[in-house]
Each structure stands twice: as structure tokens, then as C-alpha cells.
Amino acid sequence: MCTAATYKTKDFYFGRTLDYEFSYGDEITITPRNFPFKFRHTSECNSHFAMIGMAHIADGYPLYYDAMNEKGLCMAGLNFVGNAVYFEPKNGKENIAQFEFIPYILSHCDSVLQARKKLENLNITNTQFSNKLPCAQLHWIISDRNESLTVESTNDGLKVYDNPVGVLTNNPPFDIQMFMLNNYMALSPKQPENNFGKSAELTTYSRGMGAIGLPGDLSSASRFAKVAFTKLNSVSGDSESESVNQFFHILGAVDQPRGCCEVKDGQYEITIYTSCCNADKGIYYYTTYENHQISAVCMHRENLDSDQLCRYPIQTGEQICYQN
């Protein structure tokens, strides 16, 4: 399971946690402008916007989990098991395989507005990357500094939702997640007043009581509410270090330590990595379960006119600063 969020100070930030019980071997991957995307059902794209993100490279192809392009458009795919449905290619539609969806949108679109137009005639197909890599059951968040969308392909077809909170987790479907936020409308970062009854002399006995009722478990619906509340009430300076620091704290609200989410005997879901993209500067920051030091890759330090992928292995192993 996973959580994605947006955040804006003077720059725009986007990122996600990837929570799972194992890794496929992920790399920070820059796809330059002239890398050929050979889409399965539509024309090959040999010139496009450059992008950077976390990907598994299979047969030289970047299978992105999350990424941003050089124009500041960001996108992430999150588990949507049991609800995601993809279709056979359809005549008259722009047919894009599930694994192509992120590079297709980020190759062609410089904003959510453009992405919205692309989605009007899009069909996400059930074409597998290979027999060893079947379709992942996902839904997606697409964001820029102005707005966010959630995209879900279900039995009812392709659904595109405005996402006013800039947050996505997993099940249930996005419209239900948004509806359930009604349960928390009374929560506040401020201390509560006694509205229980005039005859009951009630007082606060702890800080933070305005948010009593905010979920703390690791279920996707609870993570959605907790990160939405945390993000919407976050306060930070607008420098790069302050903004990045705050973003990691926002997603840290739903960090998964090993042992708290057992998926089968002896196997536990953990937060494998957390990412934070500065979409204005093209910098991809990340931490991993084993390494809490923030690492970064800047796409603009590479040759973005190349036709070859630029790959950086994840930095693992805890980095500890000894002071004596």
C-alpha cells in the first residue's frame, strides 16, 4: 500500500511512500527527451519532455512508480487491488497499456489541464509488459502546482476526479475516500471548546485534543484522512530545506515500521522509500527504510537531450553523523 501527497510553498512539491513487503530493485531514473518510447498500441514517441522518478528497469524500459517531467507535471501509481479493471484495445480510442500510462502522460503533457484533455479519449489496456510482469492493479494521481486529478480505470470505464486535497492512498475508490472525510470535519489543530453540555464542566487535559478521532492505523482509508489533515494544516518556511523537511514530515505521519502490518507469516509491509519532488527545480529527493538521510538527484545536471536512460542506484545503509 502507498500514500501520495502534494505540498506548496514558493515551489511545488509532490511525492509518495511506497509501502510493500519487498522491492523489485528500484532506481532513480532520468528519461531524457530523445529516449524512444515504443508504445504498444499507438505511435512511437522519439521526442518528448524529459522526466525523472523511481522506476524498475525491465529490458531497458523504465517502469515508473512515480515521476515528474521537466515542465513540473507529476504522477504516481498506487495500489488499487480488486477495483482496477483494464480493457482490450478499442477502436477510436487512444489505447495505452497500464505500464505505459505514466510515461505517456508525462511525455506529452505540461500541465494537469493538458492531461485532462488527453484522458478524454484514453483507454487503459490490459496489455502486459511481459509474462513475468503482469498488469499491476493501480489508480493514479496527476498533479501540478495548480491542481490534482485522480484517475481510476474500473468496470465502469475510465473515471477522472478532481482531487481538491492533493492526496491519494489505495482502496476504497477515490469518491468514497473523499466522502468519508466528512467524518472528520470537526477536527482542528486548535484546542477544543466544551460543546458537550452546559452542565458538564469539561476541560482539556492535553495538547492536541482538537484532533481526537484522527485515525492512526495503517489502513488506506485511515492514511488518506491522516495525511490529508496533516498536509492541509502544515505550516513551514518556504526555503528549499524547510519545504523538503516539512514534506517528509507530512508523509512520515503514515510511515510503516516493520512488524505493524503483517501480510503473511513472517512478512511485513514497510515503507520501502519516501520521495519528494521539487517540481519547479527538477530535484528528486528520497529516503529509504534503511537510510533516513535525504538523498537527491537533479535532472537538470544531466544531458536531457540524450537518448539513453540515466540511472542512479538507491542509497542504502543508515548514514549516522557522529558528533564525538
Model-inferred region functions:
Residues 121-159:
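Catalytic cofactor-binding cores of redox enzymes
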Residues 20-22, 81-83, 156-159, 166, ...:
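Short, surface-exposed beta-strand-loop junctions and turns on beta-sheet-rich folds
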Residues 18, 79, 144-146, 155, ...:
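Short, flexible loop/turn elements at secondary-structure junctions
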Residues 15, 77, 151-152, 161, ...:
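Beta-strand residues in well-ordered beta-sheet regions across diverse protein folds
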Residues 1-93, 126, 313-315, 321-324:
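A contiguous strand-loop segment
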Residues 1-9, 13, 127-128, 135-136, ...:
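C-terminus-biased signal that marks the final domain/tail of proteins
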Residues 92-128, 240-248:
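Proteins synthesized as precursors that undergo proteolytic processing into mature forms
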